[in-house]
Amino acid sequence: MAVSTHISHATLPRRRGRVASGACGAASTIALQAIALAATLVATAACAEIIKKEDMLRGITTTRDRCAATAWTLWLNVDGEDFCVRYYLSTAGGEGTRPVIFLTGDHLGTVNTKTWQWIPIGEDRNANVTFDPAATYRDINTDDLIKTADAFSKMAKTTAIYLARIGIGGSSGNHLFRSTLLELHLMNAALDAIKQRHGFEGFHLAGQSGGSTIVTGLAAGRSDIACAVSGSGRLMRSYYSSSTDSARTRVNPLEFIPSIAHNQSVRFIMVTDSADRSVPAKEQTPFAERMHQAGRDIPQYFVTATDDYHHNVVGYTELVTGGCVLRKSDADIATAVGNMVKGNAAYSEQRRKEIALLAQNGIASRQPSSDSRPAPEGRTRTRGGGT
């Protein structure tokens, strides 16, 4: 993996020189001051943008100069390709030198990995079966990304960063190559660059769906990760490829099990809805079982998502990540998750009643969501808990 980095930001102050040994306190203070200033700058300099789905479907291209003129960007050369990676930093809930990094799920439908083209929505057999086309084929408002970073920051009471994945959220590249070794290498290089820019000590990681696949690879390959939370992550599908092209080689989470199992510095946690239609539990739970066989027990929290596909567990992932960052026990996190499950079940039941009333009055005909079923009380599979 070849990586070169040019860190560009129109306004963010850069730290100069090295801090001498023994000056860790001063270094941390400087880093926190830089974070606070950076968070102020993002509120004033980074206006909301709408990233069009048509552009993302084609693949996002940019120049080094345009990247440098855009707030919160990194110009990286990874595996022989230039990328402009964008991120959104928040200190809404607090500041720290080990931020939470969030990686979102996949967008834009299904990829034909034989041709490496998008499957047209009319021909995509997964549409309306494993995903809602209206939810994935849509523009992205960068305000929403900042709000997500805010939510993680408030829950974990520290700095949080929404790191835009390849080809979406403001990062350049083609999202066709999501969950590949190229994307893993790109996100890893972005963490190195962010760490250098802000003087961070390390990171906590959180992912949703496809983002969790990348989280797993980062947790296995880095020594500076404390918490790693997989939300609805497809962690059991084994990919074989004879390609030597990192852009066409899918990440294989199973290969990471030995590294994670033996890395006692990382606390790995899973969040799963047993009724998930997008990434079934059978493609999540065996990862925890394989980890157990490798000598490492990890918590897996079973939850009830409120969307029709039982797949979006970001709210739960925020809660679990916050608990991990704040060093709560597995039991304490399980209690908090159980309370959230009950609250979401009450919300779903109320929504079902409102929809039924509207339908009865002839105002709406939408059927109640399947997530009004009884909640599973946030049950966990821990086999001894996390580390």
Enumerate the language-model features and the residues they cover.
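Short, surface-exposed "cap/lid" segments of acyl-processing enzymes
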Residues: 80-156
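Cap/lid segment of the alpha/beta-hydrolase catalytic domain
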Residues: 131-134, 160-181
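Alpha/beta-hydrolase active-site loop
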Residues: 174-197
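Alpha/beta-hydrolase fold nucleophile elbow
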Residues: 198-209
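Glycine-rich nucleophile elbow surrounding the catalytic serine of serine-hydrolase chemistry
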Residues: 207-217
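Active-site nucleophile loop of the alpha/beta-hydrolase fold
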Residues: 230-239
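The feature captures the conserved acid-bearing segment of alpha/beta-hydrolase catalytic domains
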Residues: 239-304
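C-terminal catalytic histidine-bearing segment of alpha/beta-hydrolase fold enzymes
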Residues: 294-387
